[in-house]
């Protein structure tokens, strides 16, 4: 066989490119896609929020080389860090959190796990989508059976909706012409009942099902006495009414004074059939966390059903079920052919990168559950220093990228009330509310028994479809004091029925949608505010308001927000004129409410007493921000995050008055601009503001700001300005009278050991300086700044250091660590504040601390730095468990990855008998594994050769025995596209001339074109042969798997080489065309068992591809430039290159 290529410029790609490209796609795209699931987690009861900045993830390069990992029996992996923002009630922090260790692929295309090289095989699985199939009865000889024939000899038609992750759904028409829905571990469901549950009315269902025989509802009746559809539907309605009566009776039977009434109500609602059905439908098909079609599956469904649903909507819709049923009935009526499930277009390849991505997704789901459990069940006082008392048993919510909330509380109603269909017709969404409505409920305290009674009444009303929102019912009942007597409740109930919203159906062209249009009379505004008299200075309270999402006149605020902002600024500048001329921008009703309730009054804060020095700094910083606000001073030259925080703060702080009483300086009050969404501002919020302003003042004292480069990214977000000032501690040499501050700060991403040691000669600021040790050394140069004190640790004395003593180190600069001096002359800081900053530094640089402790200990012994207290450093190391470190552990992701490499059958020890065995092992494709085929039950159809395998899967190389046909190898030119489908190259043929450019076609596209084999002879100008007669000018070709002869001018594509149809191992067999197929199969397998020679020799008979296999296996040294080898020894190899310029 001649292995020549028609275009010599088309070279064979890297034989390990399948593995390398897949892992590269994981690092660039797949990892970010999985980390975006960690958007943020919030617990509103405990006022805790975790925000994951998934797009800014970082890797630390492995500390060891692959060779060292094998020798030391370690895993060649890289640490994955992600910035996480932690927000509590009174504290905020941004931390680099270690999520886990991702095993890295070597240049040779394999992994090293515990010192052992391992390979993750590619897996061939069924492509997600919709597939139609027919199972004929063996007794039925003729397939031409009418659809009206009700005999048992008719075939069974069914279609499978296969997702990438989730439950398989089968639509089936049995021999009795009944349509069913089938799922695993669930009894079959009638199609009509399933469509009604999805929100379709009988008119749509009758329009869908052409024949009346498809409307059989005999599943509710006795099969021996079938009835028509009308009687069956009547029985359905009767049973539903009976269930409604039984539920009302169960509610009436409950004792109103029973303290456990809430549990009983939840149990009754949980065991109700419609509620369970909502849970089942949502979790099975409409929840993105448990069901995923993938963009490929959505594309296949849209193509077969002629839909236009966006590709990013990867869950099922009611339209998919409706039109899939319609297409199934059409195929059953016309007796259409079923889909070919062995076609390569219905199979896709899961490469190692995708398998790793799936395991990472499972690990992230476990991590979310772990975080939520810790937030709900752990005492978080040790996480947040100033946190208030927390309650146990609260619920948390996960906010995904599409802003869909999945509440993790077991008794939550969210899963039932958020079906994307008409099935949740009791739920009212906020966007359907009428304009100008809002509800603000009174916050009256009731005893437990009264609350249970109100809850029972509200549930009765909800079930009777009288009201929509349970919170509104309770608020309405509380405001009316309905528990006093029964007559008042009856009057209220009659009044409420008259005011309740009626159901108004709005149908579109298809008649599939409906919604509720409520009346605005049922919503009331009853704020209960403890207003503060601005003139009395005895008591300072906060304005507290319960504003729901519907908010304070939402439509009014949207239209008049700018005018309100202008008016508020006028009020803030002149506090005495609160609501003068408000009628010009507000309606009369809103004006009256504002005058009575004072919605938009200023907040008055009573902060705690603070030290005089810090308050002076606070006052200076506020004055500076005021200058920036009124354009009296230019904005500071900080990075984007700092500018954002300054602009955010200057819009709220307008005035800060300072007063001294009893030798104590306190902040009397601060005017703060109100917000419309959340008006109340906690008192402890002031401490965060204080810390921000103190830190900002350090940079403002000199009138200039530090010009931080883009390299300082995540550590300086929002509040981390203090990281610029002090990230570590000063180390002074007791023997050196002129101390040189040395930075021991290193990069999070290490470069090499020599560079780390080179940075040890730079120093930084240390808190709690031992003044008795440093007094003699610092007296000469800092006598005017430091006072003598015998106390080794003076907490009250602020440490003052000159600007030449302070340097900044940047850990995120691409060029490495560099120093930058502060511009300001001096700065003030208390020892306690510097200690906090030291702890923040150690939290984010745990790896650095572990590496540098040994170096510092050696320096102490050599340079006699005896004043360093190792006990204190160890305490800092033990205190590294920050709020995020306690909530987020690496066990979830590391455990999921260990399952892939340790338990998954697709992860195998790398075959290292010879270079060919290694290359073949890395390119292998297996149909077995999780989600694949079981070799004990695999039929011959799965194992056999399909026409679409040409140029994509080798028909020769496959194992012998049970795995025959289930484990294959791709051909030498095949590649995997972005969607996981195999492609093979072809040359375009234009009017009988072969073009130079190659086109990669998948199996579905190739089936549409006229393709010729690659062994046709052609002229020097790449023209196909043209004979004198018509017969001689015809060439063989195939289209749609049919072979025939056709004129050369009608050919559209041609193969590139005879080598295109076989794999790498098969291409090394000489004279393959003269070999028997069975012997060629055994020969391709036995080549991988050959033991390599100690002294390499060229083969006596070869095909010319042996050198390429050796080169891509990385067993030999390769030069980057071509040339002539002039010298070889056991120490060096000299290659002489030739350049045209020389």
UniProtKB/Swiss-Prot annotation:
It is found in: Plastid, Chloroplast. The keyword Hydrolase does not apply. It catalyses: RNA(n) + a ribonucleoside 5'-triphosphate = RNA(n+1) + diphosphate. Keywords: Chloroplast, DNA-directed RNA polymerase, Nucleotidyltransferase, Plastid, Transcription, Transferase. It comes from the Eukaryota. Belongs to the RNA polymerase beta chain family. DNA-dependent RNA polymerase catalyzes the transcription of DNA into RNA using the four ribonucleoside triphosphates as substrates. This is DNA-directed RNA polymerase subunit beta N-terminal section. It comes from Pleurastrum terricola.
């Amino acid at each position: 066989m001649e292995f020549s290529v028609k275009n010599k410029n088309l070279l064979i790609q890297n034989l390990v490119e399948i593995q390398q490209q897949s892992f590269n796609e994981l690092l660039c795209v797949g990892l970010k896609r999985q980390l975006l699931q960690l958007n943020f987690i919030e617990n509103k009861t405990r006022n805790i929020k975790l925000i994951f900045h998934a797009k800014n993830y970082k890797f630390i390069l492995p500390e060891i080389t692959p060779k060292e990992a094998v020798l030391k029996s370690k895993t060649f992996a890289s640490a994955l860090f992600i910035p996480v923002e932690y927000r509590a009630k009174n504290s905020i922090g941004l931390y680099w959190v270690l999520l886990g260790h991702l095993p890295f692929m070597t240049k040779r295309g394999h992994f090293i796990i515990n010192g052992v090289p391992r390979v993750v095989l590619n897996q061939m699985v069924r492509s997600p989508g919709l597939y139609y199939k027919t199972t004929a009865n063996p007794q039925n000889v003729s397939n031409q059976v009418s659809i009206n024939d009700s005999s048992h000899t008719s075939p069974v038609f069914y279609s499978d909706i296969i997702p990438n992750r989730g439950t398989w759904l089968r639509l089936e028409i049995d021999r009795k012409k009944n349509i069913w829905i089938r799922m695993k571990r669930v009894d079959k469901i009638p199609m009509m009942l399933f469509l009604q549950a999805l929100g379709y009315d009988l008119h749509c269902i009758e329009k869908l099902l052409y024949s009346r025989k498809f409307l059989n509802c005999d599943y509710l009746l006795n099969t021996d006495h079938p009835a028509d559809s009308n009687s069956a539907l009547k029985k359905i309605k009767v049973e539903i009414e009976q269930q409604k009566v039984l539920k009302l009776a169960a509610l009436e039977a409950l004792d109103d004074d029973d303290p456990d009434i809430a549990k009983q109500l939840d149990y009754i609602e949980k065991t109700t059939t419609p509620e369970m059905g909502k849970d089942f439908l949502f979790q099975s098909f409409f929840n993105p966390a448990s069901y995923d079609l993938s963009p490929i599956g959505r594309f296949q469904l849209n193509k077969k059903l002629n839909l236009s649903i966006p590709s990013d909507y990867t869950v099922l819709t009611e339209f998919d079920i409706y039109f899939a049923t319609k297409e199934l009935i059409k195929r059953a009526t016309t007796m259409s052919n079923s889909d070919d499930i062995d076609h390569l277009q219905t199979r896709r390849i899961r490469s190692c990168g995708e398998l790793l991505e799936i395991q990472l997704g499972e690990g992230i789901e476990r991590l979310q559950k772990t975080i939520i459990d810790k937030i709900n069940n752990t005492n978080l006082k040790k996480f947040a220093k100033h946190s208030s008392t927390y309650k146990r048993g609260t619920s948390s919510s996960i906010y995904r990228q599409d802003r869909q909330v999945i509440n993790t509380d077991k008794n939550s109603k969210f899963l039932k009330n958020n079906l994307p269909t008409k099935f949740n017709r009791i739920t009212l969404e906020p966007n359907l509310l009428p304009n100008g409505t809002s509800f603000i409920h009174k916050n009256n305290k009731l005893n437990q028994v009264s609350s249970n009674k109100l809850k029972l009444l509200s549930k009765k009303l909800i079930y009777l479809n009288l009201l929509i929102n349970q919170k509104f019912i309770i608020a309405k009942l509380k405001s009316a004091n309905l528990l006093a007597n029964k007559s008042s409740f009856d009057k209220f109930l009659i009044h409420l029925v008259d005011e309740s919203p009626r159901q108004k159906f709005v149908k579109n062209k298809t008649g599939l949608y409906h919604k509720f249009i409520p009346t605005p009379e049922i919503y009331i505004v009853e704020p209960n505010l403890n207003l503060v008299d601005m003139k009395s200075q005895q008591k300072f309270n906060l304005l507290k308001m319960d504003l729901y999402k519907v908010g304070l006149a939402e439509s009014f605020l949207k239209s008049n927000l700018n005018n309100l902002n202008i008016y508020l600024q006028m009020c803030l500048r002149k506090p005495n004129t609160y609501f003068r001329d408000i009628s010009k921008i507000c309606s009369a009703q809103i004006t009256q409410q504002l005058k009575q309730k004072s919605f938009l009054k200023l907040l008055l804060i009573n902060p705690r007493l603070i030290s005089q020095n810090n308050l002076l700094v606070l006052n200076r910083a506020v004055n500076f921000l005021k200058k920036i606000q009124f354009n009296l001073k230019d904005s500071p030259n900080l990075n984007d995050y700092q500018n954002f925080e300054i602009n955010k703060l200057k819009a709220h702080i307008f005035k800060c008055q300072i007063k001294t009483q009893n030798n104590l300086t306190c902040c009397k009050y601060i005017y703060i601009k109100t917000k419309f969404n959340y008006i109340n501002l906690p008192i402890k919020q002031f401490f965060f503001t204080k810390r921000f302003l103190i830190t900002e003042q350090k940079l403002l004292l000199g009138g200039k700001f530090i010009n931080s480069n883009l390299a300082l990214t995540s550590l300086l977000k929002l509040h981390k300005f203090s990281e610029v000032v002090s990230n570590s501690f000063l180390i002074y040499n007791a023997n050196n009278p002129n101390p040189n501050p040395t930075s021991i700060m290193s990069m999070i991403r290490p470069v090499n050991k020599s560079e780390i040691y080179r940075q040890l000669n730079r120093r930084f600021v240390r808190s709690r300086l031992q003044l008795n040790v440093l007094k003699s050394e610092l007296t000469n140069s800092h006598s005017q700044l430091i006072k003598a004190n015998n106390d080794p640790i003076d907490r009250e004395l602020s440490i003052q250091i000159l600007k030449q003593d302070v340097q900044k180190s940047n850990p995120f600069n691409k060029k490495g660590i560099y120093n930058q001096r502060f511009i300001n002359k001096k700065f003030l800081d208390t020892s306690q504040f510097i200690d906090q900053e030291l702890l923040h530094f150690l939290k984010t640089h745990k790896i650095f601390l572990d590496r540098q402790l040994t170096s510092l200990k050696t320096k102490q012994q050599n340079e006699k730095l005896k004043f360093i207290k190792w006990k204190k450093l160890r305490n800092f190391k033990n205190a590294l468990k920050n709020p995020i470190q306690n909530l987020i552990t690496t066990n979830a992701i590391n455990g999921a990855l260990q399952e892939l490499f340790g338990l998954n059958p697709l992860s195998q020890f790398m075959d290292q008998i010879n270079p060919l065995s290694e290359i073949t092992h890395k390119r292998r494709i297996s149909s077995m594994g999780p989600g694949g085929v079981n070799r004990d039950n695999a039929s011959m159809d799965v194992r056999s050769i399909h026409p679409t395998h040409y140029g994509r899967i080798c028909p020769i190389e496959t194992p012998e025995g049970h795995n025959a046909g289930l484990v294959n190898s791709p051909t030498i030119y095949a590649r995997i596209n972005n969607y996981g489908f195999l492609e093979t190259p072809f040359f375009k043929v234009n009017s009988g001339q072969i073009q130079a450019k190659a086109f990669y076609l998948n199996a579905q596209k190739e089936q549409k074109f006229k393709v010729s084999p690659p062994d046709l002879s052609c002229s020097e100008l790449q023209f196909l042969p043209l004979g004198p007669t018509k017969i001689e000018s015809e060439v063989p070709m195939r289209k749609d798997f049919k072979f025939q002869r056709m004129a050369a001018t009608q050919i559209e594509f041609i193969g590139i080489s005879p080598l295109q149809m076989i794999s790498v191992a098969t291409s090394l067999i000489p004279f393959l065309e003269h070999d028997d197929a069975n012997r060629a199969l055994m020969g391709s397998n036995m080549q991988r068992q050959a033991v390599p020679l100690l002294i390499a020799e060229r083969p006596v008979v070869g095909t010319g591809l042996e050198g390429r296999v050796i080169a891509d296996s990385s067993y030999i040294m390769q030069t980057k430039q071509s040339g002539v080898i002039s010298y070889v020894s056991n120490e060096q190899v000299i290659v002489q290159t030739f350049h045209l310029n020389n």
